Every structure is written in structure tokens, then in C-alpha cells.
Design a protein with these regions (language model features):
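Bergerat-fold GHKL ATPase/HATPase_c domain
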Residues: 1-41
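Conserved beta-strand-loop-beta-strand hairpin that lines the nucleotide-binding pocket
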Residues: 1-5, 47-133
Length: 133
């Protein structure tokens, strides 16, 4: 398996591909079942956001190695309308799509590191990482 893979998100089936690849990478890297589920859920949520809010974008999934730490990094990028108020978007229960509002804050809880950058009318980039314990 490659150490990184980019998946273009253009249709709902691409979300499934991103989930599958993330799970396979997590297994190869040695993550336990619970962390595999967390990683898969995070990829699902982030790629779903790309599809719902920007229609197209990409997910980059890659193995990480920093010093004696190993893990996985997921980066989602889109060129959608952006998030005007990131602080509000990170609050539990907030949603612009009539959802439960658990997406971004839930993803942050699932992963060890979470970073979001967004510019209105330019798009959003979310980077998350999970480290092997």
C-alpha cells in the first residue's frame, strides 16, 4: 500500500473510497480497532462536509513519522464558500445543513490533533492527526 493517497471528492461514492483507504492505512500502521473506527469516522465526516458544502474537493491520507512517533494524517481541502465563523462552527449543535451539529467538534474529539483554516469564498482546509499509542 502507498504511504499516501489523494482521493478526489466529486460524488457520494468517493466518501466511501476515502473511508476504505483510511481504514486500510490504519490497519497497516497498527492502529487498534477503536482507533480504526475513530479514524474512519473522522474521514467520513470531513469528506462528507466537502461533498455537502463545497460539492468537490480532495482528501489526502498519509502515514506520518515524526521522531519516534508514527501515525496518520488526513487533510481535506475544498474551494467552497468557506466558514465565516469557525468558532461558531466548532460549537456542539451548530449546523448550517439542518444536521446534528456534531461534525467538526466531533471530529476534533476523535483525533489527537485538529487544525482548520477557512477563508470566505475561497474554501476550507482541515488537517487531523492520530498517533499510535
Amino acid at each position: 500500500m502507498e504511504k499516501s493517497k489523494e482521493i478526489l471528492i466529486n460524488e457520494s461514492e468517493d466518501i466511501i473510497l476515502a473511508r476504505q483507504y483510511a481504514r486500510e492505512m490504519a490497519i497497516i500502521l497498527g492502529f487498534g480497532l477503536a482507533d480504526q473506527a475513530r479514524i474512519t469516522a473522522a474521514v467520513s465526516e470531513l469528506s462528507r462536509n466537502v461533498y455537502l458544502y463545497a460539492k468537490t474537493g480532495r482528501v489526502l491520507i498519509k502515514a506520518l513519522s515524526e521522531g519516534n512517533k508514527e501515525g496518520i494524517e488526513i487533510i481535506t481541502e475544498d474551494e467552497g464558500s468557506g466558514i465565516p465563523d469557525i468558532e461558531l462552527a466548532m460549537q456542539d449543535g451548530y449546523s448550517t445543513a439542518k444536521g446534528l451539529g456534531q461534525g467538526l467538534p466531533g471530529t476534533k474529539r476523535l483525533m489527537d490533533e485538529f487544525e482548520i483554516k477557512s477563508e470566505v469564498l475561497k474554501g476550507t482546509t482541515v488537517t487531523v492527526r492520530k498517533w499510535l499509542s
